[in-house]
Amino acid sequence: MFANFRVYVARRRAFYGDYFAEYDTNADYHYDATGLGRIHKKGIPSVLCLTSPITAHSNYKLDIENSTDFSICAGIKTENGFEYAHDGKTKYTLTSKGVTEHCSYAVFECTREDGSSYTETLTLSDEGAKLTVKGKGKFAITFPAFLYDGKTETSVTQTENSLSVTYNGYTCTYITDGKITDRNIIAANRNGHYKLYIAEGEKEITLEIKMYFPEYHTK
C-alpha cells in the first residue's frame, strides 16, 4: 500500500492508495484559492470532485463570471454569516502529519484575522477522504457539486446529510454528520461549472468524500 504526505512550499500533497489531495496554504488568487483545491481518485475523471480551486480574480477567461473564490474548506459563523477560508483571510499552519497502516493524515491550525482559530484535519484512506473541523462556535464545510463540463451535464441527488454527483457513470458522494444546505452559487473553473453547498454543524463537523466506478452501482 502506498501512503505518503509531501510538502511543496505552500502546497501540501497527501496520498493514500488511489486517493490524492492537495492543499494550497498561500494561494495566488489569479489562479487558485487557499484551502483543499484538488482531490482525485485514480481512474476516475479528475473533474468529478475538484481538480482546481476557483477564483473570482482569474487571469484566464471563463464563460461565466465568478462571484466568489472557492476551495473545499471550513467556514466559521459570524454576525455576517459564514466566513470561509477560501477568502484568503485564514492562515493555515501544518501542525501534524503522518501515515498509519490504514490512512494518511494532516492536521492544520486555521487562524482568522480576528484571532479566532479552529483545527482542520484531512484523512485519506481506501474508503475515501474525510475532512473534520473542530473549534468553538458554529462551523460549515463548503464543497462542490460538479454540474457541467461544456458538453455533458451531471445528475445530482441530495438528502439532508448526503449528496451524490454522477458523471458518465462515475459517482462522487459527500456524506456529513451535519446538515447539507445549498449556497445558491454556481461557479466555474477551466474544467466546468460547479454548484456550491455547505455541511453545517456545531463545534465539530465532518465531511466524507467517496468516489465510485460505474460497475460499483451495477453489481
Q: Where would I find each of the regions flagged by the language model?
A:
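Beta-strand-rich recognition/accessory modules
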Residues: T166-K219
